[in-house]
Swiss-Prot record:
GO terms for biological process: tRNA wobble position uridine thiolation. This is tRNA-specific 2-thiouridylase MnmA. It catalyses: S-sulfanyl-L-cysteinyl-[protein] + uridine(34) in tRNA + AH2 + ATP = 2-thiouridine(34) in tRNA + L-cysteinyl-[protein] + A + AMP + diphosphate + H(+). The lineage of its organism: Bacteria, Pseudomonadati, Pseudomonadota, Gammaproteobacteria, Candidatus Palibaumannia. The record marks H128, Q344 as: Interaction with tRNA. Its main location: cytoplasm.
């Protein structure tokens, strides 16, 4: 590639990953500018949101690198295309993954369009730990080489045409090396802690955030044997596989194993629990997925053996996937999997290549 006069707009978050991404692209000879996105307005004060500090750090890094930093507010787009869906899913008792939707609709849609249409960018870049590789004329998504930081799970909705306009400078690095590069360059973000929490919303307590927008409906907690144990504060506050903050004290029911959420009966507003992390009620043989996205934008038409992740940081699970009616996908696991959660994403891989994924609609219980 002839990189002379190729402009790259780097999404600057104020963290070390985006800082080093900008540095590496500069060293490769690209014309680099930064862009800081503000995507949240509510509760915008110091206790919850670090946006002012993040902006200051992003500006400081850009000053150190001698590049322009653009600032843009995408709060309305985030609300319409991410947060409303996030709330709607919780209202029906599901557990969504807003980071995936944020990548799809904000970082690799709104940001990409703004950078190319308004700032004259040839490419955008982010600090994601993934690799883009061109195969048979299409850009493909590969796992980052650092297994502990690989973020391909969150990018399965991004198509090959968008991927072709994106750089991921950290894909072949591990986090320790990224911090070493930042420290050697004297970047102010070299030792800054990684951000946590919901995409762009920061460290707000999830239960507090939900309670501001959704009216909780308390109900009964029962065991898998229909024994009443206590009360829950609202099904939206709980997810499958959860063991902490169930509010049932030391109740053991004759066993020393801890309690886990194994199901939610939405129609009767019941939280169902059982003891043991491998209780049969918590396990699934497979799932049905919808809202399917394939990186190469070719719809799957025949069964395929591959691997799947049903949550981030999960080891790959061998599976057979096959298309079924209503643009859905049936996924049959090679072995039972715990806490498959409707609303989360099932993401598919062929070796190191992330080929796509979908939203988990139904989990298939053991014996089905």
């Amino acid at each position: 590639m002839n990189i002379i006069n190729k402009k790259v707009i780097v999404g600057m978050s104020g963290g070390v990953d985006s800082s080093v991404s900008a540095l590496l692209l500069l060293q490769q000879g690209y014309t680099v500018e930064g862009l800081f996105m503000k995507n949240w307005e509510e509760d915008d004060h110091e206790q919850y949101c670090t946006v002012a500090k993040d902006l200051a750090d992003a500006q400081a890094v850009c000053n150190q690198l001698g590049i322009i930093l653009h600032k843009v507010n995408f709060a309305a787009e985030y609300w319409d295309n991410v947060f409303e869906y996030f709330l709607a899913e919780y209202q029906v008792g599901r557990t969504p993954n807003p980071d995936i939707l944020c990548n799809k609709n904000i970082k690799f849609k709104v940001f990409l369009d703004f950078a190319t249409q308004n700032l004259g960018a040839d490419y955008i870049a982010t600090g994601h730990y993934v690799i883009r590789k061109d195969i048979n004329g299409k850009s493909r998504l590969l796992r980052g080489l650092d297994n502990q930081k690989d973020q391909s799970y969150f990018l399965y909705t991004i198509g090959y045409q968008q991927m072709a306009r994106c750089f991921f400078p950290l894909g072949k690095l591990n986090k320790l090396r990224v911090r070493e590069i930042a420290a050697k360059q004297g970047l102010v973000t070299a030792s800054k802690k990684d951000s946590t929490g919901i995409c762009f919303i920061g460290k707000r307590k999830l239960s507090d955030l939900l309670s501001r927008y959704i009216s909780a409906k308390p109900g009964a907690i029962i065991t898998v044997d229909n024994e009443y144990i206590g009360y829950h504060q609202g099904l939206m506050y709980y997810t499958l596989g959860q063991r902490k903050k169930l509010g049932i004290g030391g109740t053991k029911n004759g066993s020393q194993d801890p309690w886990y959420v194994v199901d939610k009966d939405i129609n009767h507003n019941l939280l169902i629990i059982a003891q043991g992390h491998n209780h049969p009620r918590l396990m699934s043989n497979g799932l049905i997925a919808s809202k399917l996205y394939w990186v190469d934008r070719t719809t799957l038409s025949t069964p395929l053996r591959c691997t799947v992740k049903t949550r981030y940081r999960q080891s790959d699970i061998g599976c057979l996937i096959k298309p079924i009616a209503n643009n859905q996908l049936q996924v049959d696991f090679d072995y039972p999997v715990a806490a498959v959660t409707p609303g989360q994403s099932a993401v598919f891989y062929l070796a190191e290549q992330c080929i796509g994924g979908g939203t988990i609609e139904i989990r298939k219980p053991l014996g089905s």
